[in-house]
C-alpha cells in the first residue's frame, strides 16, 4: 500500500522558495554537528525521466544513517480503521452526477462494476479514494527516490530512520472534514489531464533542480487551505527530531522537496536554529 504516502510528496510543493538546490550539507558548530545532509525528493517519477545523480549515492555512503519521512514504508501494516469508517457513507457526500462520474472512473481505471465499487468504497474515507485517483494519474513505469536510497542503505548496512509513522501521516487527513476531502477527490478526478501535464512539467523542473519552480506549482489548489497540516506543522515537529539525530551521527535526510520551501520549510527552520546550510550541486 505504498501509494498511501505518494500524496505526501506530490502535494508537498509550496511557495516562497529562495534556494536553487535539492541538496544541502548541514552543520552546527556550537552543537558539535560537523556534517549531515538534506535532500529533497520527488516520491514518484517516470522511469525514463528519473533523476538520481551519482553524488547522492556517494553522500549517502558517507553517512551513518538514512532518515526518510517514514522508514520501511512497504513493510508497515495499516489498520483498516485508518482507511475505513463504518459510520460513513461515501455516496451521501456526492450528488447523482458526481457519483456517476466516480463509478465511470472506477470501471475505466479499476475495472470495477458500479456495484463492486460501492461495496469496496462505500465506507472508505475520502482521502483513500483521493489517493487511488492520484496514483492512477501517475506513470505506469515509475521509480522512487526513497526506494533507491533504501537499496543503497541496505547494501551498505546504513541505519534506517524515520521522522514520523504512517499513522501520524494518515492522521493528517483525519483532521480535514469529509466535505473538504471530497473536494480534493473531485478536483483530482475532474482535472486529470491538467494534473498529468503538471506532473510532467514538475518532473522537468526537478531534473533541472529548479526548486523555486517546483515550489511555485499550483498544488496549493489541492492542499485547499491545509498547507499547515501537510507541510508546516510536520516540518516544525521534525526539527527537534532532526537535531537530536544529528547530535548522534551523520544523517542523510531525504524528504519531499516541498518540505524544503518557504518560511516554514526545513531550510528556513534549520537556519533559525543556528544551523549552517551549504548548497551541494548535483
Region locations from a protein language model:
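A cross-kingdom marker for long, charged
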Residues: 228-282
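Structured, acidic catalytic/metal-binding patches in enzyme active sites
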Residues: 26-37, 42-223, 229-230
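Short secondary-structure boundary/capping elements
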Residues: 18, 48, 233-237
Amino acid at each position: 500500500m505504498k501509494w498511501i504516502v505518494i500524496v505526501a510528496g506530490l502535494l508537498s510543493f509550496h511557495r516562497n522558495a529562495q534556494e536553487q538546490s535539492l541538496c544541502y550539507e548541514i552543520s552546527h558548530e556550537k552543537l558539535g554537528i560537523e556534517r549531515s545532509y538534506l535532500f529533497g525528493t520527488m516520491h514518484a517519477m517516470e522511469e525514463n525521466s528519473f533523476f538520481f545523480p551519482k553524488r547522492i549515492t556517494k553522500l549517502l555512503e558517507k553517512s551513518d544513517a538514512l532518515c526518510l519521512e517514514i522508514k520501511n514504508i512497504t513493510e508497515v501494516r495499516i489498520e483498516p480503521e485508518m482507511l475505513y469508517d463504518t459510520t460513513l457513507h461515501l455516496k451521501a457526500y456526492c450528488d447523482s452526477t458526481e457519483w456517476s462520474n466516480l463509478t465511470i472512473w472506477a470501471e475505466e481505471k479499476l475495472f470495477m462494476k458500479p456495484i463492486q465499487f460501492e461495496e469496496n468504497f462505500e465506507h472508505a474515507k475520502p482521502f483513500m479514494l483521493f489517493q487511488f485517483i492520484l496514483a492512477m494519474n501517475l506513470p505506469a513505469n515509475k521509480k522512487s527516490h526513497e526506494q533507491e536510497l533504501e537499496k543503497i542503505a541496505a547494501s551498505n548496512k546504513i541505519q534506517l530512520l524515520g521522522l514520523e509513522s504512517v499513522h501520524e501521516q494518515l492522521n493528517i487527513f483525519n483532521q480535514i472534514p469529509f466535505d473538504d476531502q471530497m473536494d480534493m477527490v473531485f478536483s483530482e478526478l475532474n482535472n486529470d489531464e491538467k494534473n498529468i501535464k503538471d506532473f510532467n512539467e514538475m518532473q522537468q523542473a526537478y531534473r533541472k533542480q529548479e526548486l523555486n519552480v517546483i515550489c511555485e506549482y499550483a498544488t496549493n489548489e489541492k492542499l485547499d487551505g491545509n498547507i499547515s497540516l501537510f507541510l508546516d506543522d510536520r516540518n516544525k515537529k521534525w526539527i527537534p527530531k532532526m537535531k537530536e539525530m544529528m547530535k548522534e551521527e551523520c544523517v542523510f535526510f531525504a524528504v519531499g522537496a516541498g518540505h524544503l520551501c518557504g518560511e516554514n520549510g526545513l531550510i528556513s527552520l534549520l537556519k533559525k536554529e543556528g544551523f549552517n546550510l551549504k548548497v551541494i550541486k548535483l
